Amino acid sequence: MSKANRSLSCIALALTACFLGVTPAVQAQAPGQDAAQAPAPGDKPPQKRPRRTDRIFARDLEGIWISAAYLDALRATRAPLEASKKAAPLVIKVQKEGPSYPLVRTDFDRAVLLRIIDIQPEDKPGAFRVVLAADDMNPVSASETTNISFRGQKNEQGRFERLAVADPTFGKRKFQDVIRLEEGLAPTVNGIVIAGSYADDKGATYSFSRSGEAEVPGGRFRYDLRLSPKGANCSIIEEAQDEAAGPRPRYGFRWKGQALELYEVDAKKPDNLRCGAKPVAVLTPKAG
């Protein structure tokens, strides 16, 4: 599936000398050299060209980025469905794949996959646009590309931690802040929403880890939190199993104060999941 990113590679190679600040070595005057060629008294020695620090490469964007507003809403509600009503989700993933840098964007309902073919500076300081196309191996016309504008400043370590992006598909080209996730999407969301140990009113224990492991009175299983803003009337825990193995067991949940309520899910219509009217268990976080 990997293809050579010819456009980006050619630009990177052409600019290598400038980026590294390479300058010819200055040789000392040899005995008998023409005096006219010798440095005059008081002349300053040649200065090396300063190293460029403002150039942006695809590798600078590598990682998973999430809407800062959505992340704040997730922390406030601890419920993916409610969070998506307060702030539209947006996640961007850039990951090197052979010589290519695919860039995936999603709002958890739809996803768009394109490949980075160029990164170009814009007029304002810290502003640049990423040029994307479905094909990064062959020449493409302007009509076959998508431009996404970004703004951001690298930190002292030369790394982006936060960017503003004007997404044309999921953001109506309005700038919004996105934050780099250090531990990945699922562990971040699990940690905010549900990770922890709980007990019900009968003393039975439940636990959900950041890494996606669940332990309930009925056994252990891998879980995912449903992040799609459509097709359900409550936030849902789904057992992480192949759809080919049959319908995925699901458990609805809502936070009521500090209590985590679990619900049965009616999945007769997979595109319209419904949580029961009353909780089947009410969990209280365990101390420590």
Q: Which stretches of residues belong to each language-model region?
A:
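Hydrophilic extracytoplasmic domains
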Residues: 230-288
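Short, exposed beta-strand-loop hairpins at the edges of beta-sheets
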Residues: 153, 161-171, 262-276
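Bacterial N-terminal signal peptides that target proteins for export
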Residues: 2-12
